[in-house]
């Protein structure tokens, strides 16, 4: 059963009317209602607030990394473990083919259903997850395979055990090593891009965001609690933080925005997966045709956060 957000109530009502028309066999009513539905969808989704985009990024039906992997990766083989401590189910690593091109895919997976969410730690990786990702990145480099990374996490797991095993070191090591990988790397934020937990697999030649995803240094709720000591200020925090793809593209922090199907990726997972596949293939071709892609990656990373300070007269 489809889950509708509060701002989608009119869409839900029209959809229910369409289903009733189908039961009655009333094709004329169905056609009229479908046109009305299309108009309503365009009106709502062309005027979304940043808070509503955050709701879409966290939608329980939104495609996760495993959904996309199952749809676009063929002849896939999952790789486990970090060769140091354990296998972190919050990060998945696969070898396979996208359109007959051998690739390595690394993704953050939140899981569906209570049992699976607990197994995946709600998509919050431990250090062994980031070390597993680095192990696979080095494997890809050794065998000259391009890397696709799918980012979707509220953040790195903040537990005591994670800190004892070097959470910050694991993330920092990934930032360092991914920056110098000698193979094409493409990272896509498919839902939530939460702070260092996202950055650990977001250093790439090209960093893209799905249309209704977010990327931030802290959750808006956390920001509201720290700055205003008031959770009701979440919407104010979102505006101030500039966490949407459009804001981040304007700031030069991401390279591309991947458009989603009408009503969001959760309403048409196959279409969303095909869009990601085409983006990956097109971007990969562009990177492979550039003999200086490593230099360009380095220049891009070094330019992040740079600014010019005017001297007082």
Swiss-Prot record:
It catalyses: N(6)-carboxybiotinyl-L-lysyl-[protein] + acetyl-CoA = N(6)-biotinyl-L-lysyl-[protein] + malonyl-CoA. PROSITE patterns: COA_CT_CTER. GO terms for biological process: fatty acid biosynthetic process; malonyl-CoA biosynthetic process. The keyword RNA-binding does not apply. It holds the Pfam family ACCA. InterPro entries: Acetyl_CoA_COase_a_su, ClpP/crotonase-like_dom_sf, COA_CT_C. Keywords: ATP-binding, Cytoplasm, Fatty acid biosynthesis, Fatty acid metabolism, Lipid biosynthesis, Lipid metabolism, Nucleotide-binding, Transferase. It is found in: Cytoplasm. Its EC number is 2.1.3.15. HAMAP family: AcetylCoA_CT_alpha. Acetyl-CoA carboxylase is a heterohexamer composed of biotin carboxyl carrier protein (AccB), biotin carboxylase (AccC) and two subunits each of ACCase subunit alpha (AccA) and ACCase subunit beta (AccD). Belongs to the AccA family. This is Acetyl-coenzyme A carboxylase carboxyl transferase subunit alpha. It comes from Helicobacter acinonychis (strain Sheeba). The gene is accA.
């Amino acid at each position: 059963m489809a889950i509708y957000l509060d701002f989608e109530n009119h869409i839900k009502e029209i959809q229910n009317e369409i289903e009733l028309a189908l039961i009655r066999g009333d094709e004329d009513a169905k056609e009229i209602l479908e046109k009305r539905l299309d108009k309503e969808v365009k009106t709502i989704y062309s005027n979304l607030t940043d808070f509503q985009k955050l709701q879409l990024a966290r939608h329980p039906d939104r495609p996760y990394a495993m959904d996309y992997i199952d749809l676009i990766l063929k002849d896939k083989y999952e790789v486990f473990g970090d060769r140091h401590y354990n296998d972190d189910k919050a990060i998945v690593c696969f070898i396979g083919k996208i359109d007959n091109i051998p690739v390595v895919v690394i993704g953050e997976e939140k899981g569906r259903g209570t049992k699976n969410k607990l197994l995946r730690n709600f998509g919050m990786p431990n250090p062994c997850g980031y070390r597993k990702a680095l192990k696979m990145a080095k494997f890809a480099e050794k065998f000259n395979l391009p890397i696709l990374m799918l980012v979707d996490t509220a953040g790195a797991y903040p537990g005591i055990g994670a800190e004892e095993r070097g959470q910050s070191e694991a993330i920092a090591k990934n930032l360092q090593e991914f920056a110098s990988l000698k193979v094409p790397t493409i990272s896509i934020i498919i839902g939530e891009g939460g702070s260092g937990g996202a950055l650990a697999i977001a250093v790439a030649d090209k960093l893209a965001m799905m249309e209704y995803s977010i990327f931030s240094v802290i959750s808006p709720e956390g920001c509201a609690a720290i700055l205003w000591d008031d959770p009701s200020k979440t919407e104010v925090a979102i505006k101030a933080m500039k966490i949407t793809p459009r804001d981040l593209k304007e700031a030069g922090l991401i390279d591309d925005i991947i458009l989603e199907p009408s009503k969001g990726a959760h309403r048409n997972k196959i279409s969303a997966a095909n869009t990601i596949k085409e983006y990956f293939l097109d971007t990969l071709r562009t990177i492979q045709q550039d003999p200086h892609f490593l230099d360009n990656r380095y220049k891009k990373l070094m330019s992040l956060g740079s600014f010019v300070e005017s001297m007082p007269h």
